[in-house]
Regions:
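Secretory targeting signals
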Residues: 3-54, 84-151, 197, 201-213
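Terminal transmembrane helical anchor/hairpin motif
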Residues: 13-36, 159-236
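Membrane-interfacial segments
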Residues: 20-25, 61-64, 68, 104, ...
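Helix-loop-helix units of permease transmembrane domains in multi-pass membrane transporters
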Residues: 59-91
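Transmembrane alpha-helical segments
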Residues: 60, 140-148, 218-226
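Membrane-helix interface segments
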Residues: 78-80, 84, 123, 154-159
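Functionally important transmembrane alpha-helices
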Residues: 140-171
């Protein structure tokens, strides 16, 4: 439900307000591209990050119930592997949400097309590659949220820090240091796609450097800190 409900919530307004995609105020973008971009704005800015925050905290909380952490650490497996395995679970959950997001987009586009008598459905290759890119960009963010959930054992504080870090992302993508803030990565890529669909609105070129090496560094550092924390738990 945590994976499904946010997706449904985001696409219902897109169906209800589908007619607004024709009123683009002189912006050179087609209604079907506008439908796609507007529908994914809420997902990339808030829902994907918020889902990751809640999923990581819930996953760490399973360790606390019924001495789960003691049972887990008693296994003949290194804490590093345990930590990375749990992070992989987060990634797998994210992949499931991505697949459901694609399905929901097409369902919404078909319904909107019937209501407005206009074809809002985009090419499957275009949709799948773009959505996959958005979710791949969320991996460094997932690593940071996983690190927070491991380091901050109080759930309310961990969730609070995670959700608070989401809000500035829409502003940070317009600064020169956006690449250092992983919570802004998916929204940045969506805006790049917006720039391609509507010439002159936003940059249509991805600044791979220094983004790519920095994103890898952030992911590695976050996972290292998470694994170290897991190691201290075993020593206790």
């Amino acid at each position: 439900l945590i994976l499904i409900i946010p997706v449904i919530i985001m696409w219902i307004p897109s169906i209800v307000n589908a007619s607004m995609n024709f009123d683009v105020h002189d912006i050179p973008i087609t209604p079907e591209n506008n439908f796609f971009i507007q529908g994914f704005m809420g997902m990339t800015w808030f829902m994907i990050p918020a889902t990751l925050v809640i999923a990581t905290v819930l996953l760490t909380q399973t360790e606390q119930s019924q001495n789960g952490i003691l049972k887990m650490l008693s296994l003949p497996v290194s804490t590093i592997r345990l930590c990375l395995a749990k992070f992989i679970v987060i990634i797998l959950l994210t992949i499931l949400q991505m697949l459901f997001c694609i399905i929901t987009y097409y369902a919404s586009a078909i319904i909107a097309s019937q209501l407005q008598n206009y074809n809002f459905v985009l090419n499957p290759w275009f949709v799948c590659t773009n959505v996959l890119t958005l979710y791949l960009a969320a991996i460094p963010m997932a690593a940071v949220f996983w690190m927070l959930s491991v380091l901050v054992k109080t759930p309310i504080f961990s969730i609070g820090l995670g959700l608070a870090s989401i809000v500035p992302s829409v502003l940070i993508i317009n600064t020169k240091i956006w690449f250092a803030y992983p919570m802004s990565y998916p929204f940045y890529l969506l805006m790049i796609q917006y720039g391609k669909a509507a010439t002159g609105i936003y940059s249509s070129q991805i600044d791979w450097f220094p983004w790519f090496p920095v994103s890898i560094l952030i992911t590695i550092l976050a996972l290292i800190l998470s694994c170290i924390r897991f190691g201290t738990l075993k020593k206790r």
